[in-house]
């Protein structure tokens, strides 16, 4: 479900997703709430945008510090996910590259197609950003733009915008050095290049080559300005993971930024129960399944044994940084900002649901059950768990129905509820704060009777598919689901996730039976 109320009035990127979680469209916004809301408020969309809105079932977003950062991040996310509606909705001209040709004296140009010799950089989502980088590189390194080498110097040479290889004012070797530097910038290695150029400038000054040193100084200044515009695409030698979290109501809300060669390419969020060594347990589990980065940026010092574990998995030392200031601290703060906005917008959903159902406490842990079958065969049950308003997929469960023959949703629901909570009682694990059944009065009654037999007192409701009504034990009339009401949208979101999970398991079992 798409909860517009959770969106902040801040810059960032938004990702529309389908019911399977596949990214349909990536966009950037100066104000996330206003931009995304406009999709659902306007009625005069073009056919392609209308199709996008109809197909969208989920929404994710990443908050950035500035609109420029959002612009750069949008480019990265589109190149990563290649969403089909971006290709349909955005002008294809915006996907042009910067091209350095393979000629003796390479020229720089904007290329619509990646054909021909030389090197291509991009594509760039933003024409504005692409043109800015193009101009900085062209002017800084005085590269030629002419299609054919003229026999005499053009105006660009006379105003200092071109080094004039056409009239022999620069050697092939010197021009080649400029092209090397331009290539380095376009690949994102600005920091390394500036460092190298500063050393060269000092050498020239020491040799009293003041004119050349001043030219290098001007180039460095232009590159430093370009670098400042790319906080979200910091180009470094190594990959980084940036991790931050908030602990609230015995629950950990954790955000992980994945930075590849300086480019923020992914955001992963996790919600799980608080434990004394939660951070160590999370890092051990996560990096047992994922390759550790060369640098891990965290808000607190890690135990030496954990640092050694990361080195063992990586095969070499992993740098662990706890920044107190500077650019890395800004990224750590940005991760925290995304935790606060991304997760605690979810708290409003929980409060709304608590109010609607008159629950004794905030429904921090919610479990929802669904039954799926195909003509009486491959009947399966699914259970999804939401913690802190987000799916906690680690605690999803599947049930192959064992005691029921044919189609009997009431008996099937009774079986999965009995099996789930008998096991929790046996293992002495925590009970959820709310149970949701996908179905009507009959399914609710079956589940409620099983809870009574087990002497479990947990609030339980059901949601009927067709009528979209909520049934509560003891109430004669169902509670209506109101359009755009936060609590109602949240219950529908949980129900839809349980249904999706059940259908997935059903398909898996059917495929296995066909193979047999």
Swiss-Prot record:
Sorted keywords for this record are: Cytoplasm, DNA damage, DNA excision, DNA repair, Excision nuclease, SOS response
**Might you name a Gene Ontology BP term for this protein?**
SOS response
Question: What are the GIY-YIG domain coordinates in residue numbering?
Answer: 9-87
Q: What is its main location?
A: cytoplasm
One Gene Ontology term, aspect cellular component: cytoplasm
Q: Which Pfam families match?
A: GIY-YIG (PF01541), UVR (PF02151), UvrC_RNaseH (PF22920), UvrC_RNaseH_dom (PF08459)
Compartments where found:
Cytoplasm
Identify the Gene3D superfamilies for this entry.
Answer: GIY-YIG endonuclease, UVR domain, UvrC, RNAse H endonuclease domain
All residue ranges annotated as the UVR domain in the record? 191-226
Q: Which PROSITE patterns match?
A: GIY_YIG, UVR, UVRC
Identify the domain of life. Answer: Archaea
- InterPro entries assigned to the protein according to its UniProt record, in alphabetical order: GIY-YIG_endonuc, GIY-YIG_endonuc_sf, GIY-YIG_UvrC_Cho, UVR_dom, UVR_dom_sf, UvrABC_protein_C, UvrC, UvrC_RNase_H_dom
Q: Which GO terms describe its molecular function?
A: DNA binding; excinuclease ABC activity
HAMAP family in the record:
UvrC (MF_00203)
Concerning its family, UniProt says: Belongs to the UvrC family.
Summarize subunit and interaction data from the UniProt record for this chain. Interacts with UvrB in an incision complex.
What the protein does comes down to: The UvrABC repair system catalyzes the recognition and processing of DNA lesions. UvrC both incises the 5' and 3' sides of the lesion. The N-terminal half is responsible for the 3' incision and the C-terminal half is responsible for the 5' incision.
Q: Which protein is depicted?
A: UvrABC system protein C
Q: Which gene encodes it?
A: uvrC
């Amino acid at each position: 479900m798409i909860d517009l109320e959770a969106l902040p009035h801040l810059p960032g990127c938004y990702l529309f997703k389908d019911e399977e979680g596949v990214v349909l469209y990536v966009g950037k916004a100066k104000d996330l709430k206003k931009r995304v809301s406009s999709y659902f408020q306007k009625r005069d969309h073009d056919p392609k945008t209308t199709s996008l809105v109809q197909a969208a079932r989920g929404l994710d977003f990443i908050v950035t510090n500035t609109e420029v950062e959002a612009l750069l991040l949008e480019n990265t996310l589109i190149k990563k996910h290649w969403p089909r509606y971006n290709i349909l909705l955005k002008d294809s001209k915006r996907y042009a590259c910067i091209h350095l040709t393979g000629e003796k004296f390479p020229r720089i140009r904007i290329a619509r197609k990646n054909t021909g010799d030389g090197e291509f950089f991009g594509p760039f989502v933003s024409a504005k950003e692409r043109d800015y980088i193009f101009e900085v590189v062209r002017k800084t390194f005085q590269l030629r733009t002419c299609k054919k080498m003229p026999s005499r110097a053009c105006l660009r040479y006379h105003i200092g915008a071109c080094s004039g290889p056409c009239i022999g004012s620069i050697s092939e070797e010197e021009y080649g050095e400029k092209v090397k530097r331009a290539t380095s910038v376009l690949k994102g290695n600005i920091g390394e290049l500036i460092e190298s150029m500063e050393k060269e400038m000092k050498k020239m000054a020491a040799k009293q080559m003041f004119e050349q040193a001043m030219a290098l100084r001007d180039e460095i200044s232009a590159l430093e300005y370009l670098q400042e515009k790319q906080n979200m695409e910091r180009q470094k030698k190594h990959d980084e993971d940036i991790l931050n979290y908030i602990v609230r109501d015995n629950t950990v809300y954790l955000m992980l930024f994945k930075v590849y060669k300086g480019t923020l390419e992914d955001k992963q969020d996790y919600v799980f129960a608080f434990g004394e060594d939660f951070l160590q347990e999370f890092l051990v589990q996560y990096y047992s399944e994922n390759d550790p980065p060369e640098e891990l940026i965290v808000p607190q010092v890690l135990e030496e044994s954990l640092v050694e574990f990361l080195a063992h998995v990586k095969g070499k030392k992993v740098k662990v940084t706890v920044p107190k200031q500077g650019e890395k601290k800004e990224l750590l703060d940005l991760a925290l900002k995304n935790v606060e906005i991304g997760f605690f917008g979810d708290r409003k959903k929980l409060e709304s649901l608590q109010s609607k159902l008159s629950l004794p406490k905030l429904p921090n842990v919610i479990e929802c059950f669904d039954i799926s079958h195909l003509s009486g065969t491959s009947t399966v049950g699914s259970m999804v768990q939401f913690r802190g308003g987000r799916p906690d997929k680690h605690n999803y469960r599947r049930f192959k129905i064992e005691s029921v023959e044919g189609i009997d949703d009431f008996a099937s629901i009774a079986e999965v509820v009995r099996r789930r909570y008998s096991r929790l009682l046996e293992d002495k694990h925590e009970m959820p704060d709310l149970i949701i059944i996908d179905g009507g009065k009959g399914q609710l009654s079956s589940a409620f009777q099983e809870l009574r037999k087990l002497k479990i007192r947990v609030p339980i409701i059901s949601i009927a598919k067709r009528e979209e009504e909520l049934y509560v034990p003891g109430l004669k009339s169902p509670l209506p689901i109101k359009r755009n009401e936060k609590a109602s949208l949240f219950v529908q979101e949980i129900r839809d996730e349980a249904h999706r999970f059940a259908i997935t398991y059903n398909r898996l079992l059917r495929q296995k039976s066909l193979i047999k």
